[in-house]
């Protein structure tokens, strides 16, 4: 079996566009995601959060408006990789593996604030004013989430034996 046929049998896709519609639909419907990081001893820690995603370009980009808690900060300092998982009772799932980085640029904070207010993708997001005074509030911190792997599986495909679709960022 050549590598191209292996990729197809595993559901691997070359372009994010091949999973964008289902990614947006599932994330927009589920909204809440489990974010998992690991500590210095490799032990996982999960928390439920709402990231937002920009999916209109060739490659997706995520953002998380959050508090810079000591645990999250220590975990990401030791290992910037994190995973976000979405699941619905219809067995629709999205898993996003990212490299996370704290961003302190005021323009980026305003941009992320607006993404939350307007929903990105539609359905995801919320009014961050319920937690913070505005994008300049020092408690409002932003994580840039650069996906390197995204796996999408619709429940109807699961029961039909269709493999999940996996997109990976090409780092050359």
Name the predicted role of every residue range.
Residues 8-32:
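Short, basic/aromatic recognition patches
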Residues 47-50:
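Conserved beta-strand in the GNAT
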Residues 25-40, 82-86:
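A short, Trp-centered hydrophobic/proline-enriched beta-strand micro-motif
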Residues 31, 60, 96-98:
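Structural detector for hydrophobic anchor residues on beta-strands
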Residues 52-91:
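A short mixed-secondary-structure module that forms the rim of ligand-binding clefts
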Residues 2-15, 95-172:
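Charged, gly/pro-rich active-site loop segments
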Residues 37-41, 55, 86-89, 154:
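Short acidic, glycine-rich loop/turn motifs
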């Amino acid at each position: 079996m050549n590598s191209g046929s292996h990729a197809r049998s595993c559901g691997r896709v070359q372009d994010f566009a091949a999973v964008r519609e289902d990614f947006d639909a599932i994330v927009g419907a589920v909204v809440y995601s489990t974010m998992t990081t690991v500590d210095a001893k490799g032990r996982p820690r999960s928390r439920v959060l709402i990231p937002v995603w920009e999916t209109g370009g060739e490659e997706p980009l995520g953002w998380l408006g959050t508090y810079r808690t000591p645990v999250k900060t220590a975990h990401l300092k030791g290992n910037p990789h994190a995973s976000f998982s979405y699941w619905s009772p219809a067995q629709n799932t999205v898993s996003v593996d990212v490299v996370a980085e704290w961003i302190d640029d005021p323009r980026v904070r305003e941009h992320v604030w607006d993404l939350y207010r307007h929903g990105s993708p539609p359905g995801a997001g919320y009014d961050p004013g319920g937690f913070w005074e505005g994008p300049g509030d020092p408690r409002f911190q932003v994580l840039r989430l650069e996906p390197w792997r995204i796996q999408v599986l619709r429940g109807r495909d699961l029961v039909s034996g269709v493999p999940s679709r996996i997109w990976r960022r090409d780092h050359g």
